């Protein structure tokens, strides 16, 4: 995807060397935006092969409101293992905030259910927002949310999504996040009888870890290939009824996978 390559080049050309929480070191810039027209194909990176199975299962896990890695591990997904405690718990991470945000009166808010309701009944609303950044519960999270707030927008029968990502690991995280929120947009469009529009990805601290520089440069040398298509195979009515088997990826022809170490 040219948008991703342009991001990589921008950070390499204009970024500053910075230290970070993990001690690895980064090249970083602040404030960057990419746009993806979901009618032009599913934005799954082609300059390296991505594990779509992990992307789908993680998103379904978020939507369940789950915060234990058991479901992920049962489905061969290990991306959260480094942060889980001995019981597999991660605390009040994404799923908890999306589905049971703790309000000040002792009640909880199911932000996803409210979002779907508002898209269906008040599509012109400028409040179609879900936040995972809950300052009162940051200390209860194994990892504070990197992709922390997203907003939907309905126009001309199309549903678009903008994500704000406070911390963006360009080699490992960002390709995953692009695909995940594009998929979420498609799923919500399906259950609200809309067409997918754009996915807009806004990055705060956009960084390349020092130990990922060879991998990023390898991707920049690879030619982009045509985007695949992702098809939803069933007429799903509720966002919570999707299963892994409801998605089929077609015409995905990526370059080989490139390994990179996760900075914890």
Curated annotation (Swiss-Prot):
PROSITE patterns per record: THYMIDYLATE_SYNTHASE
Catalytic site positions: 146
GO terms, molecular function: thymidylate synthase activity
Pathway annotation: Pyrimidine metabolism; dTTP biosynthesis
GO cellular component: cytosol
Keywords assigned: Cytoplasm, Methyltransferase, Nucleotide biosynthesis, Transferase
EC number: 2.1.1.45
Described purpose of this protein according to its UniProt entry: Catalyzes the reductive methylation of 2'-deoxyuridine-5'-monophosphate (dUMP) to 2'-deoxythymidine-5'-monophosphate (dTMP) while utilizing 5,10-methylenetetrahydrofolate (mTHF) as the methyl donor and reductant in the reaction, yielding dihydrofolate (DHF) as a by-product. This enzymatic reaction provides an intracellular de novo source of dTMP, an essential precursor for DNA biosynthesis.
Subunit and partners: Homodimer.
Name of the protein this chain belongs to: Thymidylate synthase
């Amino acid at each position: 995807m040219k948008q991703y390559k342009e991001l990589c080049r921008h950070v390499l050309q204009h970024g500053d060397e910075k230290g970070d929480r993990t001690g690895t070191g980064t090249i970083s810039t602040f404030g960057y935006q990419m746009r993806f027209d979901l009618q032009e194909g599913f934005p799954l990176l082609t300059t390296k092969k991505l594990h779509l199975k992990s992307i789908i299962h993680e998103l379904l896990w978020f939507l369940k409101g789950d915060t234990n890695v058991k479901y992920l591990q049962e489905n061969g997904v290990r991306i959260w293992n480094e942060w889980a405690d001995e019981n597999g718990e991660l605390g009040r991470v994404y799923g908890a905030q999306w589905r049971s945000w703790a309000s000040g009166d002792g009640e909880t808010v199911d932000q996803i259910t409210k979002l779907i309701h508002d898209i269906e009944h008040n599509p012109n609303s400028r409040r179609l927002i879900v936040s995972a950044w809950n300052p009162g519960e940051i200390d209860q999270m194994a990892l504070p949310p990197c992709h922390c707030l997203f907003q939907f927008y309905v126009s001309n029968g199309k549903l678009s999504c903008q994500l704000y990502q406070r911390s963006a690991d360009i080699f490992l995280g960002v390709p995953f996040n692009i695909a995940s929120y594009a998929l979420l947009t498609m799923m919500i469009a399906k259950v609200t009888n809309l067409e997918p529009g754009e996915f807009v990805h806004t990055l705060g601290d956009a960084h390349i870890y020092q130990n990922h520089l060879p991998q990023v440069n390898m991707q920049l040398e690879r030619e982009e290939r045509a985007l695949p298509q992702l098809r939803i195979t069933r007429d799903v009515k509720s966002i919570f009824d999707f299963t892994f088997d409801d998605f089929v990826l077609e015409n995905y022809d990526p370059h080989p996978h490139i390994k990179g170490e996760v900075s914890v």
